[in-house]
């Protein structure tokens, strides 16, 4: 949307790896993000974003990004198939027993 305007643009950066960012546009796009320094040198972030879809509904997502990767949730995303969840659970059990994956 070329005519969209920024309604809100808030940014705070403490200079030490801690930050907060939030914006909203006139066409319904929203994004909020908070970050803190991570234990392995990365920046840990969590936030949410949303945008309007052509049918008038809104696509909404929440996420965490940290030393364990990027994890996003949304009603629009499919569920993990049962066989995949079983593999994830099995790997977690093995890690708990001390198995190391290279």
UniProtKB/Swiss-Prot annotation:
UniProt keyword terms in alphabetical order: Cuticle
Superkingdom of source: Eukaryota
Tissues expressed in: Arthrodial membrane and calcified shell.
InterPro entries cross-referenced by the UniProt entry: CHIT_BIND_RR_consensus, Insect_cuticle
Residue ranges with Polar residues bias: 23-33
Location of the region described as Disordered in the Swiss-Prot/TrEMBL record: 23-50
Annotated Chitin-binding type R&R domain residues: 16-81
Pfam families per record: Chitin_bind_4
GO molecular function, one term: structural constituent of cuticle
Protein name: Cuticle protein AM/CP1114
């Amino acid at each position: 949307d070329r005519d969209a305007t920024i309604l809100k643009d808030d940014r705070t950066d403490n200079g030490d790896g801690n930050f907060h960012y939030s914006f909203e546009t006139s066409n319904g796009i929203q994004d909020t993000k908070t970050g803190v320094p991570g234990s392995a040198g990365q920046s840990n972030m969590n936030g949410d974003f949303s945008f309007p879809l052509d049918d008038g509904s809104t696509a909404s997502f929440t996420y965490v990004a940290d030393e364990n990767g990027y994890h996003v949730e949304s009603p629009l995303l499919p569920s993990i198939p049962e066989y995949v969840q079983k593999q994830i659970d099995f790997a977690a059990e093995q890690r708990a027993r001390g198995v190391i994956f290279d």
